[in-house]
């Protein structure tokens, strides 16, 4: 079942939720201090401008519950509001907080099977708005959605943005989408993340992406890109690329192991070498023991680390999570 099928199946429940959000009595609003309370929604406020006015007033509330309600309000109301009014309000808004609200509403329309150009407008502003805080806000609005399926090479462009804030938000989107939308099991999402990481000239962004995504579904081209990053001038990038290689699909494991074994002897950073040992162990399980034994003399300071891996791998545990747990237990016992 596709994401679009699920979206259409959920339309009825979305409408019910929207109506409940628009109900006159809002319990969250009651939690606000009297000075911060906004009036209950009235029929006249159930318009784009009415909702925006309510949100502007309410965002100063001391009640976090009320602000959470406001964050959901416009997004969940999006399918009932005129698309042209919503888009026009988005285009003329320059307060980053309100931009994020409006962008999330437009994204929601596309996610729920309505006009695709709604999300396209958000993506275009993320790429082209002159204000980096606005660009960052629109990127956050696309987080944990299917945006990467509809926006082409947007993320490869965003990770090269002049603003560090924008680059960081783009990297966060890629990681959170990979883990929380696709569960690390979507090849397109994984390959998009790797392509963006390789395209970035910001070592922190590249490391953030490669060090956190799941790479079990990446294609051969993505594996080659990760292998090339093992030669990066940044130790942080080399360590993250090493971690990413440890999780590649079975068809790419031999190539990944060969790359890591070939780079280990020339690597000078102990943290990167330690990451390489872990990925070699992960790629080979018990079959990695002879390789680890041959590496033992390269760096005497890491001999205890290698010995710990060898001891755990010789237990023939069949789950990586169990291997990690036992390795941690051995380290704590030392």
Show which residues each predicted segment covers.
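Bacterial N-terminal signal peptides
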Residues: 12-24
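Terminal, low-structured helical/coil segments at or just beyond the last alpha-helical repeat
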Residues: 297-334
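Amphipathic alpha-helical scaffolding segments comprising HEAT/armadillo-like alpha-solenoid repeats
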Residues: 41-57, 79-91, 112-126, 147-160, ...
């Amino acid at each position: 079942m596709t994401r679009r099928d699920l979206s259409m199946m959920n339309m009825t429940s979305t409408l019910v939720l929207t109506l409940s959000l628009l109900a006159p009595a809002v319990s969250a609003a009651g939690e606000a201090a009297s000075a911060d309370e906004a009036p209950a929604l009235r029929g006249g406020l159930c318009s784009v401008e009415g909702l925006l006015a309510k949100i502007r007033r309410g965002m100063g509330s001391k009640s976090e519950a009320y602000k959470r309600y406001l964050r959901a309000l416009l997004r969940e109301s999006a399918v009932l509001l005129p698309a042209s009014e919503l888009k026009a309000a988005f285009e003329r808004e320059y307060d980053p907080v309100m931009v994020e609200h409006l962008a999330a509403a437009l994204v929601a329309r596309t996610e729920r099977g309505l006009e695709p150009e709604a999300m396209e407008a958000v993506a275009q502003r993320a790429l082209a708005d002159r204000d980096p805080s606005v660009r960052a806000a629109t990127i956050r609005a696309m987080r944990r959605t299917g945006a990467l399926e509809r926006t082409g090479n947007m993320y490869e462009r965003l990770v090269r943005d002049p603003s560090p804030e924008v680059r960081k938000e783009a990297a966060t989107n890629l990681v959170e989408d990979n883990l929380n939308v696709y569960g690390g099991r979507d090849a397109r999402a994984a390959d998009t993340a790797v392509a963006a990481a390789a395209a970035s000239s910001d070592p922190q962004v590249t490391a953030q992406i490669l060090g956190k995504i799941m790479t079990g579904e990446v294609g051969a081209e993505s594996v080659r890109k990760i292998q090339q990053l093992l030669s990066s001038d940044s130790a942080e990038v080399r360590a993250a690329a090493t971690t990413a290689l440890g999780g590649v699909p079975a068809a790419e494991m031999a190539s990944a192991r060969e790359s890591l074994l070939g780079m280990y002897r020339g690597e000078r950073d102990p943290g990167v070498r330690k990451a390489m040992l872990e990925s070699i162990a992960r790629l080979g399980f018990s079959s990695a023991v002879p390789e680890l034994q041959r590496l033992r003399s390269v760096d005497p300071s890491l001999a205890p680390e290698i010995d710990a891996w060898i001891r755990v791998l010789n237990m023939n545990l069949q789950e990586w999570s169990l291997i990690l747990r036992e390795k941690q237990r051995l380290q704590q016992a030392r």
